[in-house]
């Protein structure tokens, strides 16, 4: 991925509503609704990271990155503003075309119903990555509405 400045990342429109984002120029970060995209140097990749082409095992189930990114839409977990899956796949595809491997990992947090995924996409600078953090509340919680 040939991105080296925050402005280049912003111009790619990673969020559905670019009017409702917070930009932290010091940290080179775009903050959205429980999600973020930033340019950062990654010194130590988490040990549990796997290639974005592989399936991730969580709670004894296997999920592809595609399934994880589109599941909230399928189950209609509406948010006011979200990170678009197309942005993530476009970044991964561009990195793969340049023979770079992208990785992702699942982080288990105290809130056991949430989904916390970090995606690492390499840039032209060998130490710099686009880091994407997805935080989806109540991902594992079954909820439904009963009509009377």
Curated annotation (Swiss-Prot):
Q: Which domain of life is it from?
A: Viruses
Q: What does the sequence similarity comment in the record state about its family?
A: Belongs to the poxviridae F15 protein family.
Q: What name appears for this protein in its UniProt entry?
A: Protein F15
